[in-house]
Amino acid sequence: PDANTGVIGYFNIPSRNWMYEDFFFEELMPYVESKYRIKSNKRFRAISGLSMGGGGTITYALHRPDLFSAAAPLSAATGSLDIDKSIQRLNSFGFKYNRDEVRSLLKSNHPLELIDDIPLNKLNSVRWFIDCGDDDYLYEDNSLLHIAFSDRGIILEYRVRDGEHNWTYWRGSLPKVLEFVSQSFHQF
């Protein structure tokens, strides 16, 4: 969603007039559900993405567990909770954010910030499938998610296979993701 806009991410950033999450839930989803013959309730809705889209997948499912029966992030880019590291990483991609913007983004969107404030029954109303390659540069972040989810009592499938942050790895994951999502539609 960055598309050379000078902002990055699937989240609302009011200071940058970037309301991507609102667009996703208030415009894109209703449009898709009105245009195509699909069932538009939680029981038949899942979300999945890879890399930055994997980070968006987790956060959207945490923000709106009432909407998704399953969430399947692959190689999720969640970033560091350390403000200085986050600023450095954003700068490396050419994005300039100040400390207050980064602090606000982390507090309202980072999964490790969110899971303690959501009732466990809501967290477990979503079936979780987290998958990341053991040579992926995001492996540590995904491992920390797995540990935090497990410590919180969130039921999840966590998969680590040989692989990097690339399409070769993700293509190998897609059959399992589709099977997992399909099974999620039959859980009710």
Language-model features and meaning:
Residues 1-188:
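Non-catalytic cap/lid and distal C-terminal segments of serine-dependent acyl enzymes
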